[in-house]
Amino acid sequence: KVPNYSVGDSVIVTGTTSSYGGLLQYPNTSTITRSGKSESYKYPKAEEMDAATLNSWMKSPVVKYAKVSGKLKISGNYYNVEITGLNGQGSISYPMTGIVDPALNGKDVDINGYLIGVTGSSTKYANIMMTSICEKGGTMLTPIGVLATSAAGEHKAEGVVIAKYARGFLISDGTGKMLVYNSKGYDVEEGDVVAVDGKTSLYSGLMQFNSPKVTKLERTAKVSQPVAQELTAADFTSYVTAPYYAYVTYTGKLSITTNDKGATYYNIAIDGTSAQGSISFPLTGVVSPDLNGKTVTVTGYAFGQSSGKYLNTMITTIAEATPAKAKIAFRAGANVQPNASVLYRLEGT
């Protein structure tokens, strides 16, 4: 499943572990619940691993944040790394589509990421959960998930456009998400891979790029959205005091109003809380005026709060709610599917 978390999120994982690739792991039937997030997160210093140290590690693997260098070989959905002297190969495990530039195929690269086990029979593979990649000797970009908790300043990022609205878009590289804002919007589409260069600042409780330079790169990606987190009334109440980026769904009564300056607001009243959903600057035609006053189900990205009351939503779909959907939209303890990109923090025993 596509991850619905960012690095630095705190989560509670419940499940039965088993051994795979020489390491213990949780199965895809595990329950994961978000319990908070770090206000400032950085990866540890990457340990440089040459062929000798990797050979030793492969005999007795442990999770380790490392820097690995070698020749990248891309074949379909496989991203293997040939390392001279290694009794096997490196393998980038399930990177987000579009993040590894196909132009790097056949070139020497540097990779930062977590070593997460050894698989294979005739050929052994050291599996890497990649956080960044560049041509050998180049400059590693800071992962978006880290930028999202870093101090405001001048920053660069590359990632996939995963959603857009009239004033910008969300970008992701698999480690996290950030809003790229411009009051005039950008000529990009979902699935475009872009480079972003500009200033970041804290707004609506989350870090975002403000009117940066955006360059479309010569590749695109197929975007698959995560399983949406079903928000309860309690989730709304807590979100407006501690916002986070996530793909969400919720049900409530839509109110469309226009003020004397011509600004239109799309707010959704939620039973059981004074907090509300707010569809932020939807693209033309996405929200039908016929839905005004009706109970609707909204799905999209939560990306901050306004006035301590509104959960800002970059909408992907909206529809009149069926009675069955209205009943389940506020159930407690909705399960979020596990993923391969979150840094787990286990709570309890």
Labelled PLM ranges:
Residues K1-T349:
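OB-fold single-stranded nucleic acid-binding module
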